Structures are given as C-alpha cells and as structure tokens.
Amino acid sequence: MRFLLVSTHVDQTTGYSKVSHNLLKQISTLSPKVKTFHFGFQRHPGRSSVRKVPEGVITYDAAANEDPKEEGFGFNKIHEYVEMVNPDVVMIYNDPLIVMRFIESMKHERGKSSYKLWIYLDQVYEGIAQPLIETIRDHSDRIYCFSELWKKKFLEYGSFPDVRVLEHAVDPTVFSYMPPSSVASVRTNLNIPSDAILFLNANRNSQRKRLDLTLGGFARLLARNPTKPYHLLILTNASPQSGAFYDLQRVFIEELKGQGLDVQTHVRKLLLIDSSPPNLMSDEAINQIYNASDIGVNTSDGEGFGLCQLEHMYTGAPQVVTDVGTYSSFLNSNVAEFIPKNGRTYFAGSMPHGLWAPTFSMESVADGMEKSIETLEDKRKAVSKYTFKSWSTVCDSWLEDVLTCGAPESSVSVQVLS
C-alpha cells in the first residue's frame, strides 16, 4: 500500500511542520505494509535541519523543485508527483484554501482517479466560503477534523461521504518538565527576575492570533497591580519582512500610555523574542521557554486546535485562552481561564476561511490573567494530574484506517509508536 501525505515540510518551525512530523513518525511504523511518501512544502532554505524526516519516509522538497518558483507550495509539481508515486491514498493537510488549490492542481476526480483523497482540514473560523466547501465535498473521499467540535461544525455545511476526528498531541521526546535549577538558569539568561510571574504568548504574529489583545490585557493587569512583578514574554515573528502583523512594541507603549502608566517603568516588563528568519528557535529552546514561563496566554479570535497551549501545559503551566470553542477539547476550568466572548465581527467578503470571528475585550483578558495568578497553585496541581494523550493514542484509529484502506484482508493489526 502506498500512502502520500501532502503537508508542510518537517524541516520548518511551524505547528503544521510539528504535526506533519508526528503523523509521519506514526505511519512509518506501518512499514513494510505501507510505503510512505511526503510531498513537503514551504521548507525554508535558511532553516535547515530543524527536524529530520522519520526513517523510511520518502520525502520531496516541493519548494526547492518548484518550476517556475511560486509560493513554495509546489502546486505546479503536485500532479506529476502524484502520477510518479502512484499512491493508493493521498492525504492533504492544511487550511481550506490551500487544500482547494492542491485539489485543483492534482486534477483529482472522486470515483475516477486511481487513488482515494483524504483531507486533514484545519478550520479556524465558522462560515468557510462556499466554493471551498464545494470543492472539498465534491472531490474528497474522507475528511479528518481536529476535534469533535470542528467535526460537528463541518457537518453543518452539508452532506459529506465520511467525516472523522484526528486530534493533535504532545511529543514527549521534545517537550518535558525541567527541574527548578535548570528553569532558574533559563530565567537568568532571559533577565527575568526570580520572583516574577511570567506570562508567555508563543503564537505567530498574524491578525488572527490577536497579540494586541494580549498586550492590552497585560497593560491593564499592570495598571491594577503596578508594583507586582508581572512580566510578559512574547515569542513570535516581529519583523514586517517576515509577515509580522502587529508592531508589538508600539502597541504595548500605546496601551501603557492609555492606562496612565509610566512607560519607562513598565515597558521593560515586556520581553520580545524575535523568531523571524534567519533566527531559529529549536524545539529544545522552545521547551526551555515553556518551562521558564508560569502561565500561557492565547488571545486568538480563531483556533484550529491550540498546539502551543497543549505543549506549554505539558511542561506544567496553566493557560489563559479565549473561549473560541476548540480549547474545550483538551482544556477545562481546572487548568485554564477562559476569556468570554462579547460579540462578533464579520470579515470582508473576500475572506475564504470564515464569515465571522468572536470579539473579546482587553479588560476580560486582564481579568483572565489576574484570575490565573490568584489560582496559580491550584491550577498547577490540576495540571500535574492531567492525563495527556500521546500521538500513538490519537493516531491509532487513523493508522487502522490506512491499513484497512490498503489491505484486502478483513483484519489488520497496528503497532503504534509512543
């Protein structure tokens, strides 16, 4: 059986690349019954050797082979690559727009093409544009959603052949709890006071991630507690050339002024770590930052899963998140504070990924941050008792699907990798 995954190259630093790596690591355990190929796109030439392709997986660098050069996705190469590999199953993993473009470039026809087409769909907002939904519905044989919530939302678009759930998980070989002495050393290197309560937002600097809400909420937290040792670390792309949406330093200064705070006194309580190219944040470095931070924050107005929050919590940190729905698949009030919605805003008609997004106030963000400090010890205890799913657990049924699709025999067995 020949299986082809079309997704972000593992030699990247995004959440997509982490998930791709773990999916490939799991499916590689099915060798020799399953021969796995990876059409890996958007590999950044300046960020080589971030992580290795799992043993036994045959990978193709779509960005390097594009001709002519486009966006690094390899749309002009996917059709000939599929014909060359001759797979039994192709699974595309990305957002609806990218999925649609691959489907169109592959020229797949359900029931006529020689392979089955599966979609691992990243949904972040409700109300995906109808042309994208129709393309996915008309061409795919099976769709995997990140959670039961997103499966339910997706089924509201109409009738689909087969919709299932494939969650995310934490890789314990990469992320782990560090002893206090090591954490103290990391905080010293970051110039974080030993008595500080450190918040962390490690999300991309895009409009959807709403880092402005984090900054405004933190400024209001400082206004309520001007003498407390509260600090915020934001690990993100800060350079406009790398696609950064917010000018984080200017936003924070503006919010401090708006709260009547002395800028010189409080601006130093924000630490920015720029992950823009050519800077490289390895998984090991991110694990150190996770461990050095007391509480995680995500103020996104739309989220597919929230892998940063799951990873950070795995190292022992409670979370503060916007109530966008998807977090309820792995977070509860024992380990997280949920920032309530106060309305919605509609997107421009050209927005393909959704019709609207929930809105949140900076005051509510400050409330969540303040409450997380007040309940920090209780939440830490709850996190220590939390049962985390492994990649082998979340991929178990998916691997069964792969074997069942490729094998004529009635029974198959799966040996999964922890």
Say what each PLM segment does.
Residues M1-R47, V85, S392, D396, ...:
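N-terminal subdomain of nucleotide-sugar transferases
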Residues S176-I192:
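A short helix/loop element that forms part of the nucleotide-sugar donor recognition site in Leloir-type
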Residues F245-Q288:
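Nucleotide-activated donor-binding/catalytic signature segment of Leloir-type glycosyltransferases, i.e.
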Residues D301:
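Aromatic "clamp/platform" in nucleotide-sugar-dependent glycosyltransferases that forms part
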Residues T359-S364, E374-T404:
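A charged, aromatic-enriched C-terminal amphipathic alpha-helix characteristic of glycosyltransferases
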